[in-house]
Amino acid sequence: MLEVNDGTGVFADCTLLEEADLSQTGITELEGTFEGCSALETVKLPENITKIGFGTFTGCSSLEKMDLSQTLVTEIGGSAFSACSGLKTVKFPKTLTAIDSYAFLSCKNLTGELDLSQTAVKTIGICAFYKDGGVLGKIRLPKTITEIGSEAFSWETTDGPEKIYVITSLSKDKINAEAFKRNVPVVVCPYLYTIKFDGNGAAKGKMSEKACAAGQKEKLSK
């Protein structure tokens, strides 16, 4: 039995590794742990893990799902899941506060609903969910969000998500240039402020409280 006490790069480039169980270890942080493990299909993580660090699963093209909902993860680091071309679903924990730049870059099969509404996410980094193939179905953001990086939700195709739910107050938020690069419908959630975007995804002001209370759907154009 292999005893693992440190999650830094321990299985990097093990291209024949298909399954890994770290659930009984005391590891709380991972970094580069499974980078380049192209055959990896199943991973069990310890519930007390707090950080999925830089490049942890980069290039794990056979990984189809990741369930972090029962963990204590607060941060998903830069490029943590980049180039996971087979990744279809991700469940996020309530403890999550940050998704760093390029975290899910080029996850072309991550096309279902991206639901962050039950998390405590404050920041989403540059190109965090940038896609070069396929588009997200729906994006739900939490009311805790304070910053969305440039091209965080951009994609190469002209088709956008079905809807984007923005639950936030613009006066407290920072939305960087081209955060939502393509034109998308934005759903105004009842009794909450929301954000309108111009054709390049830049912030364009906020809806009135009256309009938000009624609930509206804004189709944005260039």
Q: Predicted segments — roles?
A:
Residues 11-12, 34-35, 70, 118-119, ...:
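A structural signal for leucine-rich repeat
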